[in-house]
Amino acid sequence: MKKKIVEYEVGEQVDVFLLIKTATKGLASNGKPFLTVILQDPSGDIEAKLWDVSPEVEKQYVAETIVKVAGDILNYKGRIQLRVKQIRVANENEVTDISDFVEKAPIKKEDMVEKITQYIFEMRNPNIQRLTRHLLNKHQNEFLEYPAAMKNHHEFVSGLAYHVVSMLDLAKAISALYPSLDKDLLYAGVILHDLGKVFELSGPISTTYTLEGNLLGHISIMVNEIGKAAEELQIDAEEVLILQHIVLSHHGKAEWGSPKPPLVKEAEILHYIDNLDAKMNMMDRALGRTKPGEYTERVFALDNRSFYKPTFHN
């Protein structure tokens, strides 16, 4: 079986086809331009540098371009990189489709839809159920395709839906332990909290922020979407305001992007569930690339820590 990019170890030679996920221009200390490219295949991605690039080269190596790369793997300041020795744009007859190079959620879309639909079916509050079903149906196609973020966690095709499914299972388990929680509110908050990402992000491949995403952000976008849905469904009840608050506060603090802190119980729990699932995804993916007895590369979003994989963990 062909080796995946995350399976290569430091010092190994690489000669593979990869997809350029992003390409960012920089200026070296000698004043010459270079490109930082993130290269990917279905297993994940790796950073590489292209030095002394000309304007012509910059135009060649852009996001969503499939390239043939030869080089070796190195560890630079705790991060795994691909040192490029040769690179060229792939010919049409050498590769099939971009979708063959992107990482995808480990659960099928239809299975995720079925699971989320069941959680909505279990809701007993008609206002919460109608609002949630309406908004999910309205944006379902994008919801099932988009990543949950540009980087850090669930940044792969269908990552948004996968994040939500994992959070719903966490919400169910926590609600069983703490029956005073309003399951309808918590489930709806989980499903809707990041739905604004379908406006904030450009799409599932070579993801960037849209103009709306840069100027408004997914939180305020979703608060407005809930308000519009309530008008369309002629729902004038406190549930609308509480759902808006849950979405508005799910980052927890102003410095993390929420204008208000959680002020209802379900909003507080949603914040912790969201944080837990995001961090578990980051740790699992980093440790999945690591041998027992070794440390992961540094995980920037987790305080730039390297995590140890015990020798008794395979």
From Swiss-Prot:
One of its GO terms (molecular function) is 3'-5'-RNA exonuclease activity. Belongs to the YhaM family. One of its GO terms (biological process) is rRNA 3'-end processing. Shows a 3'-5' exoribonuclease activity. It comes from Bacillus mycoides (strain KBAB4) (Bacillus weihenstephanensis). It comes from the Bacteria. Keywords: Exonuclease, Hydrolase, Nuclease. Coiled coil: none annotated. Disulfide bonds: none annotated. Residues 163-279 form the HD domain. InterPro entries: 3'-5'_exoribonuclease_YhaM, HD/PDEase_dom, HD_domain, NA-bd_OB-fold, NA-bd_OB_tRNA, YhaM_exoribonuc/phosphodiest. SUPFAM superfamilies: HD-domain/PDEase-like, Nucleic acid-binding proteins. This is 3'-5' exoribonuclease YhaM. CDD domains: HDc (cd00077), YhaM_OBF_like (cd04492). Its EC number is 3.1.-.-. Pfam families: HD (PF01966), tRNA_anti-codon (PF01336).
